[in-house]
Amino acid sequence: MRALLPEEGRGLFNDIVSGRVLGAGRHIRMIGDMMRSIAGLRIPAHEKLERCLRLGEFFKETRGKSSYAIVTAVNLMTAGFAEADGEADVDRLIEERVLAYFENSERDTLEIVRRFRNLVENQGLKKLMVFDYSSTVEKCVVGLHLPVEVYVPESRLIDGGRPFVRPFVEAGHKVHFIADAAMLTVLKKIDAVFIGAETFYPD
């Protein structure tokens, strides 16, 4: 799959599959950027669409198994690709589909951040715990107008806690980076726990 990408897309691909970059939201943006890099290749239009579809299927079957947000995003970004006319302006189609997804996603994220801020501030929540890296959870906590105390378990399996620390400190919050095994020792003092939605499964 990596070989189907231009050079600028291969680094993004590697960052996802190696786990160097975490967060479904970030991975979705990187997948969109890879599709846009395919649009810039000097290859037949139908092959560009085919590569984008194959790339999307790859990530749906791999990263999408742990985060359905990936599956939904890829489906939205590639909508209409399979039926596209060979004479269509494929570069423009790819660009428009990817950008439309991110415009809608940005609007939705801003609304989530606003509602999160209302919840935390209206309920007077002062001590939070965040678990398992999520770029959306990061944006929510960074977007709070008032400083809070945040406990961040290390999420050792994928080092999923560490990426939270710097943004929270820079936003003015008091941060405790703790071992996973210490979670139960602090839960009694926590007002609320927030995790990325992909941590939950219907079953």
Walk through the language-model features, giving the residues of each.
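Long amphipathic alpha-helical segments
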Residues: 1-97
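Gly/Ser/Thr-rich loops at beta-strand to alpha-helix junctions
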Residues: 24-25, 127-137, 157-158
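A short, well-structured juxtamembrane/interface segment
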Residues: 104-124
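Nucleotide donor/acceptor-binding cores
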Residues: 125-126, 148
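Histidine-anchored nucleotide/phosphate-binding helix
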Residues: 134-146
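Conserved phosphate- and dinucleotide-binding cores of soluble alpha/beta proteins
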Residues: 147, 153-203
